[in-house]
Each structure stands twice: as structure tokens, then as C-alpha cells.
């Protein structure tokens, strides 16, 4: 158990979000097919590039018997006009040196050091916005161990977790609510960042595209 420690490595002050416009016009919203009668209010909206989505899914499918995972990097942002906090996830970092099995995943100290060094060296302008891992044949949910990892490794209110189930082609984000509470029973969808006339890459069966007045029909193609 000596290698299963939590490191509190120094990082720049990233509590202040980047001021920028929320890219709703350049994204397609994917929502869970089944939602609560009174939907939860997440602290942040998640925007994910197609490249980041593909890399996370590809890594998730690399081992269909054991859990795999890693970190998600990008930007924590705020749109003052819309009064919305949101994340831009554009970088996926697969974790090396993990302690993993069919029903568990642990980021070891070596894994954390390697990921922090890689992030600092190659992506110094980006922030650690969350983590992802798989639940092979178990569904999209947040276990008590997942909750412990999230609380201790990703304590900032705006950091999120993505769970991928590679066998059933499903996935979802776990996001703290505006009151700071993380409901481990409920997952959220995300906004897929899409270039004009580019087809959607999302194929998770538990999510469906949702269009609203902020999404121009000419900007996205769903297959």
C-alpha cells in the first residue's frame, strides 16, 4: 500500500477561471436519454473536443477486462455575459504505472509524478480539469472508491470525472453541483466541440443529441 499515496504537488493558482465566451454555437450537446424529474444543476458545463473524445474512447477500449484511466487537461473558464462556468477538455493523458484490476484503478505516486511532469513540460498553459476511467461490463456509475479518488486527487469544485463502459458503448460525466455536492448516482452528458460541416464522433448509446436555439443547423452533422 506504500505506493498508493496522495500527492499534493505544487501547481499554479488556477482557482480563477479564464474569461472567455462559452462556445455553444460550435458544439453539439449530448444529454442522457433518461433524466431525473428535477434535473441537478452542475457547477460547470463540459465542452470536449472530438480529438479528446476519440483518444479517451480509444484508451478505454485498449483493455476490455481491466479498468484503465488517465487525466483530462484543458481550461477552466467563465463567460461573464452568460454567467456560465465551463470546461474545455482538449487533452487526454493516459496514466502509466497504475494499480488496476477488473473492478478498481489506483493512480500510484509514480503515475502522478509522471503525469504532472508531462503536463508541465508539454502543456504548461493547460490545467488539470479532471480524470477518466473505465468500468468494463459494470455500467456508468461512481463507486465509493471512485468518490474517494475524486475527493482526494481532484478536490477543486470544477474538476470532473468521466466514466466509460467500453462493452456497451456508454459513458458519462460526474460533476459537482453548484452547492458543492457530488451525486454519485447521476451522470451528465457533454458538449461536443465540432467544426463546421464536420460529422459528430460521439457514439455512446446512453446519450442523445439535443438541439436548441443556440445551435445552428449548418454547424453539425450527426451520423
Question: What label would you give each PLM region?
Answer:
Residues 1-128, 137-223:
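Conserved beta-strand-loop surface patch within small alpha/beta domains used
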